[in-house]
Amino acid sequence: MGDQKFQRKKYSTPRHPWEKDRIDAERQLLIKYGLKNKRELWRAQTILTNFRTQARTLQAKLRYNDPLAIKQFQLLIGKLSRLNLLGENATLDDVLSLNIEDILERRLETLVYKKNLALTMKQARQFITHGHIKVNDRVVTIPSFMVEKSMEDSITYNETSPFTDENHPLRMEMSGTKEEENE
């Protein structure tokens, strides 16, 4: 009953396919965040666009003190604060000032790398897809999983993963690189 008849695209492509500046900026983001292809970047851009569109619509409705718009504003800010994109007392201008990097920073792939569970972004992606990472006691195999603020501290290795052993060669290598960075 709730099944979709057709799957829809979850992203929109750029209006002009061959803009050099946009292509270069996208390439830098792909490298920085270890994305597999531009489709993942466009999906994050679409998520950001949807948040911004909703904020602009609410901004227009709030001028007329619409009670439903006030409730929708609270829900939007609540969602963005759960994702740790904004604070609890954020405004619509804060929503409009979000950028693509804010969205990409909340991906599981990025947070695994930032928590030093992997040496590189590509390795973080591989750990996730191979089932070595768990969030809230559940194995997550989706690198683009958006991690909420409450889940962030529970990102660890899976118990069945060989990386839980502190004496694993890769873990020893990671602790060695941490010590070198601290010096």
Curated annotation (Swiss-Prot):
It comes from the Archaea. Transmembrane segments: none annotated. One of its GO terms (cellular component) is small ribosomal subunit. Residues 158-183 are annotated as: Disordered. Residues 106-168 form the S4 RNA-binding domain. GO terms for biological process: ribosomal small subunit biogenesis; translation. Gene3D superfamilies: RNA-binding S4 domain (3.10.290.10). GO terms for molecular function: rRNA binding; structural constituent of ribosome. Keywords: Ribonucleoprotein, Ribosomal protein, RNA-binding, rRNA-binding. Residues 165-183 have a biased composition (Basic and acidic residues). SMART domains: Ribosomal_S4 (SM01390), S4 (SM00363). Part of the 30S ribosomal subunit. Contacts protein S5. The interaction surface between S4 and S5 is involved in control of translational fidelity. One of the primary rRNA binding proteins, it binds directly to 16S rRNA where it nucleates assembly of the body of the 30S subunit. With S5 and S12 plays an important role in translational accuracy. Belongs to the universal ribosomal protein uS4 family. This is Small ribosomal subunit protein uS4.
